Amino acid sequence: MRDQERTLNQDVERCINVLQDFLDTGSAKAISVFSNKTSENEDWLEEIRVKYRIKDNDELQAIKMLKQKRLDQLEALESKVDYYEKLCDELEEFQDEMEVKAKLEQNRRSRFDSMTRK
């Protein structure tokens, strides 16, 4: 019975050792892959950093202020365009009224001229 226990313990220890080796190998592979990807990402980050210069906060603030200034100017222009469009509509309406009045005046004159000739 002691031999069976010893054999069983040895078998369990071998299983533990095999399992530990498997886990160690898997962990080493995962760490290696992680290290490679980390290294690749660091290289890529450096490549990006060189290619695209990151602006400092003062420069970003200046850009935001310029953008806001341009938006304000655009809004002012849009309001002027709206004003001139309305003014144009009113002028067209006035022109139409003047044409009608001119025709009425012409008709009156023509009637008046025809009455004075008789």
UniProtKB/Swiss-Prot annotation:
Xref: Pfam families? BLI1
**Which positions are tagged coiled coil?**
55-104
> Main location per UniProt?
other
A GO cellular component annotated for this chain's UniProt record is: endosome
The record's subcellular location field reads: Endosome
UniProt keyword list: Coiled coil, Endosome, Transport
Xref: InterPro entries = BLI1 (IPR020491)
Q: How does it assemble?
A: Component of the biogenesis of lysosome-related organelles complex-1 (BLOC-1).
| Described function | Component of the biogenesis of lysosome-related organelles complex-1 (BLOC-1) involved in endosomal cargo sorting.
Entry similarity comment: Belongs to the BLI1 family.
What name appears for this protein in its UniProt entry? Biogenesis of lysosome-related organelles complex 1 subunit BLI1
Organism for this UniProt entry: Zygosaccharomyces rouxii (strain ATCC 2623 / CBS 732 / NBRC 1130 / NCYC 568 / NRRL Y-229)
